[in-house]
Structures are given as C-alpha cells and as structure tokens.
Amino acid sequence: MRIIYTIEDISVKGGAENIITQKANHFATEYGHDVLIVSIYKDERPASYPLAKGVRLISLNIPFIAKNCNVICKNINRIRMLLCLLKRFQKVVDAEQPDIIFFTLSLGALLLPFCRTRAKKVYESHSARQFTPYHSLFYPMERSADTIVCLTHGDAQNYKKTKHVCVIPNFIEQPKRSVADYTRKKAIAVGRLEAPKGFDILIDCWKRVAEQHPDWHLDIYGEGSCRNDLQLQIEQLHLNDRITLCGRSNNIMDVYPEYSLHIMTSRYEGQGITLIEAQACGLPSVVFNFKFGAVDIVQNGVNGIIVEQDDCKAFSEALCKMMSSEDMRKKYGENALEVGRQYFKDNVFGKWVELINTLKQ
C-alpha cells in the first residue's frame, strides 16, 4: 500500500512531529507499506526524528511568510503561499498515486478538500480544534475527509459533519525503567517553553508551596521562546535555588524515574503526550483539567489529582497534598503504571491497522 503523510515542518522537534514520524516508520518497517512524508516547509535542515530505511521524504520548500510586512502584504503572501502549496502538493500526489493520504495539522486541513485524488483522505487532529490556527476554515475539510482521527473523545465532539470520526490516542514506547523513586523530593514538568504550556502559572504555584516544602525542587524540561521570560520570573520570585530550567532532554523517558511527582499546567493540549509518558514511568500527576485529554488519562484520586483550569490556589493545595505524603505518591504512582501501559505502541497501533483495513474495503 502506498501512503503519504503531510507534515508542516519535519525539522521541528515537537510531539506531533515525533508521533507522525514513528507511525510512518512503523508502517514501513513492520507492515511493508511504501511511505512518503511530504514536508511543507522543510528545506535542507535534517529531520528532527530519525526516519526508517523504508520511509521516503520530500520537501515542497514552501517559503515562510515574512513577519515584518504589513497586514495587506501578509494576506497577499498567504494567498500566494497557499496556491503554490496546492500546486506542488497536487504534483506529488499525481506522481505517487497513493492509496491513503494522512493530512495533519492546520495546513493539512487546508490542503485536504482541494486535493484531487482517488486515495482515501484521513485528517489527523493533533490539537483541540478550537485552539488550532485557521480552525474556522476547517468546514470544507470536515465534509471532504473520509475519516477524521482525534486523540481524545472531547475533541471528537468538535467534528459533526464528517462521514466517520474515530478516536486513536497517541502511543509511546515502553520505558526501559518504570519504577520511580517516591522518596525523592523532586518534581518534573516537561514541554515546550511556550504560553500554551502554562509554565508561568506553574512557577507562581511553586512560589505558594515553596515555604511549606523547602526541601522540594522543581525541574522543567524543554526549550522555547518563553525561556527568558520564565527565567526572569523565577529570579523575581527568588526561586533560583528551587526551580531549574533544564533545557531539552534527548531521552526524557530515562529522566522521569529520577522524580517522584509529575506536574502539568497546560492551558490546552491535543492529548498530553508528556502526561502519558510520566504515567508510564510510574509518576503520579497533578494536572489542570485542560481541553482535552486530562480526564481521559487521570482519574482523580486514583493516579493523580485534577484541578479546575487556572485555579492556582487549588492547584497549590493539590501539590502540597501530594508532596506531603510519600505513601500517596507511591499508591498513585503504582496506579499510574497501569494507565501508562494502555498507551504502549503495541496496544495502540492495532487501531491504525484496523482503520487502514476498513478504508481499503
């Protein structure tokens, strides 16, 4: 079977790029499919994640829209970019004659309804629809897609006019080590240092609990445009010796077991892959009830604590509750291991195979 995956920029190191690359690799190596990844923006920069031998990669080399021009100029350039994108992508589709095309992210949604092909068209939603750029332009895609795949049941409710909507969560590799040390008074948070991840809120919450728990330390892993602002916030709150911005880890799954508590303050998520990773490593989680995914993964009082969005006082109280009890962390962490196993690749990938077999009929 010939499969095409679209992706906006294969050189970006993010959760969506990681999971798309893993799926392409698995389809090629384990099932023998002919897989092509079409990167819209990529030029000569290397792919952010390794590609299997059977996966081909081409770039449409669509230029980025300049940020320093006025609104009229931006809109004109945006139209030119989209027309160029449609033309170049159609040329690839005509040459490849795929059986299935997986469209991903915002530009994928814009491409889908205009692509002329006999292939089945599948749109993958990697972020909650209402928080996705250009989501108001998704209606043609909704009507044109053969299937829309969402990460959560909450996001699936956003698509009402599609022939078929299904829910397939992200998957993770089974960790080499999945026993956390619950005696350690160290908490971890992971994600891009960008506004949607809510690390500014987390730092404020940590200030509230710092005096009550002077022996606890918070490490934040990730990089992004907000790093300098977050570092300044840490310094202004005199938390330099209590919070560390650790940068990006090459293998975060080896890092989680060094901690006894996972924290997530996202304002919204597609699903929350770092939450799944932490659970699979036996870490209890304190999370905001972000849209969407928290309630799909965390059962309040079983494998973590869920707090209503942006309630910093309640979040700080939940942190104190977890930090004060090693027994609670151990109990919730053991339950988290069971939850994490549900998202191992071997337990999830069969749903993708089932979807492809259904589309072939």
Summary of predicted features, one role per range:
Residues A314, K321, M328-Q342, K351-E354:
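A short, well-ordered alpha-helix in the C-terminal region of glycosyltransferases
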Residues P284-F288:
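Short hydrophobic beta-strand element within catalytic cores of glycosyltransferases
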Residues R248, R267:
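Aromatic "clamp/platform" in nucleotide-sugar-dependent glycosyltransferases that forms part
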Residues Y5-K13, H26-I79:
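N-terminal strand-loop element at the rim of the active site
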Residues H126, Q130, R143-R177:
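Donor nucleotide-sugar binding/catalytic pocket of nucleotide-sugar-dependent glycosyltransferases
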Residues N289, Q299-G301, I305-C312, K321-E326:
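Conserved acidic donor-binding segment of nucleotide-sugar-dependent glycosyltransferases
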Residues L85, F103-A109:
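Short His-centered aromatic/hydrophobic patch
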